[in-house]
Structures are given as C-alpha cells and as structure tokens.
Amino acid sequence: MDEEPERTKRWEGGYERTWEILKEDESGSLKATIEDILFKAKRKRVFEHHGQVRLGMMRHLYVVVDGSRTMEDQDLKPNRLTCTLKLLEYFVEEYFDQNPISQIGIIVTKSKRAEKLTELSGNPRKHITSLKKAVDMTCHGEPSLYNSLSMAMQTLKHMPGHTSREVLIIFSSLTTCDPSNIYDLIKTLKTAKIRVSVIGLSAEVRVCTVLARETGGTYHVILDETHYKELLARHVSPPPASSGSECSLIRMGFPQHTIASLSDQDAKPSFSMAHLDNNSTEPGLTLGGYFCPQCRAKYCELPVECKICGLTLVSAPHLARSYHHLFPLDAFQEIPLEEYKGERFCYGCQGELKDQHVYVCTVCRNVFCVDCDVFVHDSLHCCPGCVHKIPTQSGV
C-alpha cells in the first residue's frame, strides 16, 4: 500500500534549462509561445477521449469540498472558497449536460467533521442553489478526509454494480485530521470499487497520492484559475468502467410527468418518496409528479432509482443525450496551414484560417479551426459537415 512507484527525485534528475522553452518573436513578445502551449492543451483534450471502451455512463459522484480555514487564502480571486463554488456551479451544469442519467452529491468538510450540503440527486438546480448559498459559509478548522470518505462510502456502497461510484475531492489544506487509520479506509474503498480523484489547491500531499493511486483515480494540483477549470472539466466525461464491474441489461421505467388539476375531484395531494427520506424544507404534498409505472411510487425529478421496487426511472431524452459517449467522434486530421490547398475559411464559424494548423474531418473533408474543432468534439459530438452531407446523398 505505502510503496510508491520508483521515480527520480527532483534533485536527482538532470539539469533542466526550462527557460529555453520560451521563445521571443520578432517584436520580443512571448505571446506566440503561450498560444502554442494553449493550442497543444486544446488538442490534447480531443485525443484524450476514450474510443471504443466500456464506460461507466450511469454515474454516482460525490464532490467533497474543503471548508477549512485555508479556503480563505486569496491566491485565487476573490478567495479559494468563492472561486471553487463558482467553478463548481459551471461543473454541475456541464456534468448533467454530458451525463443526464447520472447523479451528484456535495459534501463539505471543516472543523474535523463532514456534512452533506446536498444528497445524491439528478436535479442540477438543487445543487446550484446550494452552492450559491454556500458562498456565505464560514471557513475554519481542519478538514477530515476520513470522515468525508466514510460519509460518501455509506451511500455509494449500496449503489448497483453496473453504475460507477466516484468521489472527487477539492482539497485546499496540507493536513487532514482523522479519527482512525485512513490507509485502512483506502483498502475498504478499493474493495467497494469506489474511484477517488483529488484536485489540490496548495501542493501535493502524500496521502492524496496514495488515495488516488490505490482507488484508480487521478490527482492533480492546480496552477491557476484557468487550469483549475480545465481539471474540473476532465471529470465531466464518464470514466472507463473497471473490468470487474457488472455488465448486464438494465430494466428501466419511463414515467410521464402527471399534473392533476385543482378542479379535479379525484385529485389527491401526495408525498414524494424523496421528501419522506430527506429533511427537506420544500412543500411535501403536491398534486403532480412522476409515478413509477411498476409500483406507482411518486417522485419529483428524474433520473432516480425507485425506493420501493428498485426500477431505474429515466426519460427518453436522457438516454438519447448519453448516446454520444458510446460512439465518440473521431479526431480530425491535423494539417499545417501552408500545406492545405482548399478554402481558407473555417466550415464551422466561417472565419478566416489564421492558426498554424487546420483540422480536416476524415469523412466529409471539411476544414475547421482549432476552436471549432474543440467545440465540435466537446459539445456537438457530431461533425456539421457530415450532418449536412447526409440529406444530399439520400437525394432529399
């Protein structure tokens, strides 16, 4: 467990002339070098998409947010806490846009304790509202990785075997105050097939390195706010499923939203199953909702697993929006601009091609700029040229 892979220590490595990477242009500016670094980062994201790999598309993710006194540091503006909560709002929106049949929950750890900010839910508005309110939260004390992971594990270990169980920790402190041996907990997490990833805001911490390595997660330390946002974006796409995860057909129900009229004499207010379990401040008795087609249990939101009969309840658009993960769009062919003989305008945005390289779809042979290339692969998930070409071929 405690043995780290052999690698050369920083002071044992060869002398690196890192400043030679930076090159001035004719005007003495470093802008060209910086743009080249950003360009390579954008292209790397496109190629990092997993191809024909079995993915854990039904995800259950707990985000653990450090609420210790270190979150008041102002190296991120206006401070670490506010910056983190704003980026998490964006992350939640992207997460549900890319993973509509998944759920997320938020845990805050401070003063050696852990408490749930939100329960596992598929409703992004609920999480974003809680994150907005958490801006006024007081940061004090030390975080507890042990208590946070234990709280997340108590819920995740009961999730079905065909779903992915994940924890993402936003860790600002350099210490953790734990009531027991965290290395024993790491073994338990590994046995329960819970994948833990960490994003550090200060520096690398050994226990986080071991935690991520043993559970199959990732561990990165941010450089600045832009890098922070990119690291969060890496956790939007579903991870590859482990070889030991269950693979079977899943029964699903597709309930329609029913709204009863106040003038309907047979309409009877009823509680949602979610309100019965949680201490929610929202009104519990409502006339409408989603009713399980198998046992008629009522729910206010989808997706959800029925607490009575265990049936997974989703809507058809949820499945349709998850389809692109199974068949990701192939990366476009990269060609130097001076070697490209076609039109010098991007097919996507119709802007003039000014970058050093252009990107050509291998199917329809249309050309794109780097920004449209990234947008097509990250958001559209289909080539506009190929989509417009299909009706022409069929004679429509």
Curated annotation (Swiss-Prot):
Domain VWFA: 60-236
Gene Ontology biological process terms, A to Z: G protein-coupled receptor internalization; nucleotide-excision repair; regulation of transcription by RNA polymerase II; transcription by RNA polymerase II; transcription initiation at RNA polymerase II promoter
Main subcellular localisation: nucleus
Residues annotated with Phosphotyrosine modification: 95
Keywords: DNA damage, DNA repair, Metal-binding, Nucleus, Phosphoprotein, Transcription, Transcription regulation, Zinc, Zinc-finger
Lineage of the species this protein comes from: Eukaryota, Metazoa, Chordata, Craniata, Vertebrata
Taxonomic superkingdom: Eukaryota
Assembly mode: Component of the TFIID-containing RNA polymerase II pre-initiation complex that is composed of TBP and at least GTF2A1, GTF2A2, GTF2E1, GTF2E2, GTF2F1, GTF2H2, GTF2H3, GTF2H4, GTF2H5, GTF2B, TCEA1, ERCC2 and ERCC3. Component of the 7-subunit TFIIH core complex composed of XPB/ERCC3, XPD/ERCC2, GTF2H1, GTF2H2, GTF2H3, GTF2H4 and GTF2H5, which is active in NER. The core complex associates with the 3-subunit CDK-activating kinase (CAK) module composed of CCNH/cyclin H, CDK7 and MNAT1 to form the 10-subunit holoenzyme (holo-TFIIH) active in transcription.
Statement: the UniProt record of this protein carries the keyword Cell inner membrane: no
Zinc finger (C4-type): 292-309
UniProt keyword annotation of Kinase present: no
Function: Component of the general transcription and DNA repair factor IIH (TFIIH) core complex, which is involved in general and transcription-coupled nucleotide excision repair (NER) of damaged DNA and, when complexed to CAK, in RNA transcription by RNA polymerase II. In NER, TFIIH acts by opening DNA around the lesion to allow the excision of the damaged oligonucleotide and its replacement by a new DNA fragment. In transcription, TFIIH has an essential role in transcription initiation.
CDD domains for this protein: vWA_transcription_factor_IIH_type (cd01453)
Entry protein name: General transcription factor IIH subunit 2
Any one Gene Ontology cellular component term annotated for this protein: core TFIIH complex portion of holo TFIIH complex
Family: Belongs to the GTF2H2 family.
